[in-house]
Amino acid sequence: MTDRRLLLVHAHPDDETIGSGATMAKYAAEGAHVTLVTCTLGEEGEVIPAELAHLAADRDDTLGEHRVGELAAACEALGVTDHRFLGGAGRWRDSGMMGVASNHRDNAFWQADLDEAAGELVKVIREVRPQVLVTYDQNGFYGHPDHIQAHRVSWRAFELAADPAFGEGEPWRIAKFYFTATARSTMHRTAEALREADVSFLTEDAIDDLPFGCADEDVTTEIDGRAHVGRKLDAMRAHATQISVEAPWFALSNNIGQEALAVEHFILRSGVPGPAGPGAPLEVGGLGEPYDREADLFAGIH
């Protein structure tokens, strides 16, 4: 199809690159209109480079401003030209990890009024009119309050945008709503590759205890972004306060090695599945036979 429009909603700067960077770069390179909405500036993030430690929330509290620049550079690396902050930059603040005091700030995204935040996203949806929306599952992928809230806001906006009685602008019904996902088999394959490369990672048992990762059979869609993983790695390097990169590996502030995945997985939450496409090879992160998964987020949309 022509005139493809993809909307992604992520919680903080860097989430877009880690979870869907290869997919974003692929569709941007193919000429699709890719819109990224980021819900906060990531003010509560930890800072990796020692020389930038003063930016942290418990010191100068200027990390959010710095990460605006990092995100702009990452979007440039991915080829994405349409980026917005939900409600404008700084409207809602990073809530921090679940259970910390920053969850309770009045302007924390975790405290945002659902319909108000969703209303801001509806404005974007009705302007851009995307056929596809990508965000997190109801657990926020790994339980971060801002990721959970991004899911809630996205789902509510998905409903409200199609309602002619809500707000201003022409209603728009998004055809397909996806969650980002990481298949368990991919996590175990990555762990083995990291051990062979003598890179610190988790034990097999610890992987199964992580709050993310899904059964392979739950994955509905597999996007092969191998041709664009270089752009994903460049975007990761742009998020220098949050990510250290030694291709093909990267690490967050916990210094646990992970692979920059070139094949990214998604779960179709709402919409009609399109026809299955060719799967990526197992050795590069594909899920293998049976090849009954979509290979295109826009599959089946006419």
UniProtKB/Swiss-Prot annotation:
Segments crossing the lipid bilayer: none
The reaction(s) this protein catalyses: 1D-myo-inositol 2-acetamido-2-deoxy-alpha-D-glucopyranoside + H2O = 1D-myo-inositol 2-amino-2-deoxy-alpha-D-glucopyranoside + acetate
Matches recorded under InterPro entries: GlcNAc_PI_deacetylase-related (IPR003737), LmbE-like_dom_sf (IPR024078), Mycothiol_biosynthesis_MshB (IPR017810)
A GO term for molecular function: zinc ion binding
Alphabetical list of Pfam families matching this protein: PIG-L (PF02585)
Cofactor(s) listed in the protein's UniProt record: Zn(2+)
Biological role: Catalyzes the deacetylation of 1D-myo-inositol 2-acetamido-2-deoxy-alpha-D-glucopyranoside (GlcNAc-Ins) in the mycothiol biosynthesis pathway.
Protein name: 1D-myo-inositol 2-acetamido-2-deoxy-alpha-D-glucopyranoside deacetylase
Gene source species: Streptosporangium roseum (strain ATCC 12428 / DSM 43021 / JCM 3005 / KCTC 9067 / NCIMB 10171 / NRRL 2505 / NI 9100)
Lineage: Bacteria, Bacillati, Actinomycetota, Actinomycetes, Streptosporangiales
